[in-house]
């Protein structure tokens, strides 16, 4: 008996049929790391170095968990001055004023004398957050005002303290200026600084001191 095997051949594809390949669509989800509020994420690159970002995260973690901030001093001291200033400004941007003051104390120890603009920025942030007692404490910690201080920075600090309406702190700033020789031949009174200070003292109920400031400024005028 003859056995015939029949093989089933697959139907051939004619040239008239076209194969269509379905490629799955890729979707991209934008993920942004940072605080879940409108303050924006930490800025990395030219503004904040990796070391600065890590320091900020460490400070905020210590603040959140109640760990003593003194434990963060050693890592902070390893940062260069520009990184410390960047950390301070970023903390102020996020309204972590207590942490910013902590960083300022490190700057004051490691890189004296400090730019008075940093003090002014912290005073403005404390005013914004209504932490007025902290302003008095901050100004009270200033040991002296260097004669090399920039007049614009000094004026900015005075404006900030006057804006917070801290009379005693304004008087202290003036006292420190006077003790450092402001208004003398060694440190000539800048006209704009004198005007800002005089108006501020007058506004805060210190007319005698305001007149004193105006007199110091006018004496040295040619």
Curated annotation (Swiss-Prot):
Disruption phenotype: Pigment defective embryo arrested at cotyledon stage in homozygous plants, partially rescued when grown on sucrose-containing medium. Retarded growth and greening. Reduced abundance of both the excised intron and the spliced product from ycf3-2 and trnA. This is Protein THYLAKOID ASSEMBLY 8, chloroplastic. InterPro entries: THA8-like, TPR-like_helical_dom_sf. GO terms for cellular component: chloroplast; chloroplast thylakoid membrane. PANTHER family: PPR CONTAINING PLANT-LIKE PROTEIN (PTHR47594), PROTEIN THYLAKOID ASSEMBLY 8, CHLOROPLASTIC (PTHR47594:SF3). Keywords: Chloroplast, Membrane, mRNA processing, mRNA splicing, Plastid, Repeat, RNA-binding, Thylakoid, Transit peptide. It comes from Arabidopsis thaliana (Mouse-ear cress). One of its GO terms (molecular function) is single-stranded RNA binding.
């Amino acid at each position: 008996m003859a056995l015939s095997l029949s093989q089933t051949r697959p139907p051939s594809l004619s040239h008239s049929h076209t194969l269509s390949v379905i490629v799955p669509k890729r979707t991209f989800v934008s993920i942004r790391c940072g605080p879940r509020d409108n303050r924006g994420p930490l800025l990395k690159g030219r503004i904040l170095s990796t070391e600065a970002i890590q320091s900020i995260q460490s400070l905020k973690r210590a603040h959140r968990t109640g760990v003593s901030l003194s434990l963060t001093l050693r890592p902070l001291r390893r940062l260069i001055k520009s990184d410390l200033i960047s950390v301070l400004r970023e903390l102020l941007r996020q309204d972590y004023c207590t942490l910013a003051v902590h960083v300022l104390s490190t700057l004051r120890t490691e890189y004296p004398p400090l730019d008075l603009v940093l003090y002014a920025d912290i005073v403005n942030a404390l005013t914004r957050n209504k932490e007025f007692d902290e302003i008095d404490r901050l100004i009270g910690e200033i040991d002296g005002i260097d004669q090399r201080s920039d007049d614009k920075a000094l004026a900015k600090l005075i404006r900030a303290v006057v804006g917070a309406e801290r009379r005693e702190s304004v008087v202290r700033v003036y006292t420190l200026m006077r003790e450092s020789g402001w208004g003398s031949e060694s440190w000539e009174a800048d006209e704009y600084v004198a005007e800002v200070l005089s108006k501020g003292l007058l506004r805060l109920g210190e007319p005698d001191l305001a007149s004193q400031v105006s007199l110091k400024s006018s004496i040295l005028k040619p």
